[in-house]
Curated annotation (Swiss-Prot):
Localisation: Cytoplasm, Cytosol; Cell projection, Ruffle membrane; Nucleus
Keyword Glycoprotein: yes
Protein name: SH3 domain-binding glutamic acid-rich-like protein 3
Family: Belongs to the SH3BGR family.
Organism: Pongo abelii
Residues carrying covalently attached carbohydrate according to the record: 2, 9, 12
Gene Ontology CC terms: cytosol; nucleus; ruffle membrane
A Pfam family annotated for this UniProt entry: SH3BGR
Phylogenetic lineage: Eukaryota, Metazoa, Chordata, Craniata, Vertebrata
PANTHER family referenced in this protein's UniProt entry, alphabetically: SH3 DOMAIN-BINDING GLUTAMIC ACID-RICH-LIKE PROTEIN, SH3 DOMAIN-BINDING GLUTAMIC ACID-RICH-LIKE PROTEIN 3
Gene: SH3BGRL3
Chain ranges of the Glutaredoxin domain: 2-93
Subunit composition and interactions: Homodimer. Interacts with MYO1C (via its IQ motifs); the interaction is dependent on calcium and takes place at membrane ruffles.
Residues the record lists as N-acetylserine modifications: 2
Amino acid sequence: MSGRRVYSTSVTGSREIKSQQSEVTRILDGKRIQYQLVDISQDNALRDEMRALAGNPKATPPQIVNGDQYCGDYELFVEAVEQNTLQEFLKLA
């Protein structure tokens, strides 16, 4: 699978996950960075794919990848935004 993807879930009881997903998509949309939203709640294979790319069998959304390269999770994303290194984080530079 190619391109930037944000792994998310539409089914969660966690306000924290919902908030983190919203913030990631809001920032990407605001910077006009194209991405595909992948809803892992629709298929366990997608959840397994997300966890394999993250290298963490317990990884939870949101997780960001570019092609087959893992970019990071919410915390790393926010850190990149704060340090103005989002292009590098997303492996665009």
